[in-house]
């Protein structure tokens, strides 16, 4: 129930005026300045977005953890973009490498045009169903109970397992934002923070 404060990393560029989105162009130097300023001012996490115009959130966050000491990376994840077994392994590896400096921001996708352009042209309901399966698979693989089977609408696994084990027990925090009834239901079941 602790209050947390986070900041947003503008990986498509920053601005002093919202109407000019890339007034300050994106660069590794700008990202490091922003994340270090957030850390130095006591923010617990920095949100790295995922969108076509943004720099890759996973690679950017991996580099930024090396430039900081304690701030957590809140990496956005959308359904259908990364195989859930690989996603679970990526998160567990990141979690171990940084001693728990990762959280996941679940996004069902608010931009249908971008989803279709990137090959994930599912309905909103299907995106939420797929995201639910991906979260259940990640949690199942992180449970440490051995081989994991899953029989869902989108994913079917037989004897799946990953290494390394997750650092944060039982698993990292999941965040979810959204005002729809689907978002509220999903958040109540699977997210730590809404």
Predicted regions and their residues:
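Hydrophobic faces of well-ordered beta-strands that scaffold small-molecule active sites
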Residues: 3-7, 46-48, 72-77, 102-106, ...
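N-terminal beta1-alpha1-beta2 module of alpha/beta enzyme domains
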Residues: 1-68, 169-172
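A structural motif corresponding to the C-terminal end of an alpha-helix
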Residues: 37-43, 68, 137-145, 169, ...
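Flexible, glycine-rich active-site loops centered on histidine and acidic residues
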Residues: 2-24, 80-149
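Acidic (Asp/Glu)-rich catalytic clusters
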Residues: 36-40, 62-70, 91, 95-102, ...
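Active-site beta-loop-alpha junctions enriched in small/polar residues
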Residues: 10-12, 51, 76-80, 107-111, ...
């Amino acid at each position: 129930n602790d209050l947390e404060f986070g900041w947003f990393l503008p990986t498509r560029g920053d601005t002093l005026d919202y109407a000019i989105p890339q007034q300050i162009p994106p660069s590794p130097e700008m990202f490091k300045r922003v994340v270090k300023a957030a850390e130095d001012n006591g923010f617990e996490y920095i949100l790295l977005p995922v969108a076509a115009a943004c720099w890759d959130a996973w690679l950017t966050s991996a580099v930024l953890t090396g430039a900081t000491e304690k701030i957590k990376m809140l990496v956005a994840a959308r359904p259908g973009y990364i195989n859930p077994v690989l996603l679970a392994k990526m998160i567990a590896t990141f979690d171990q490498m940084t001693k728990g400096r990762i959280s996941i921001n679940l996004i069902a996708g608010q931009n249908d045009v971008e989803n279709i352009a990137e090959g994930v042209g599912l309905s909103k309901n299907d995106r939420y169903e797929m995201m639910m399966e991906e979260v259940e698979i990640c949690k199942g693989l992180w449970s440490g109970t051995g081989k994991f089977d899953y029989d869902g609408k989108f994913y079917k696994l037989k004897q799946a397992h990953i290494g390394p084990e997750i650092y944060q027990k039982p698993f990292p925090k999941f965040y979810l934002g959204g005002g729809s009834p689907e978002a509220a239901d999903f958040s109540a079941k699977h997210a730590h923070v809404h």
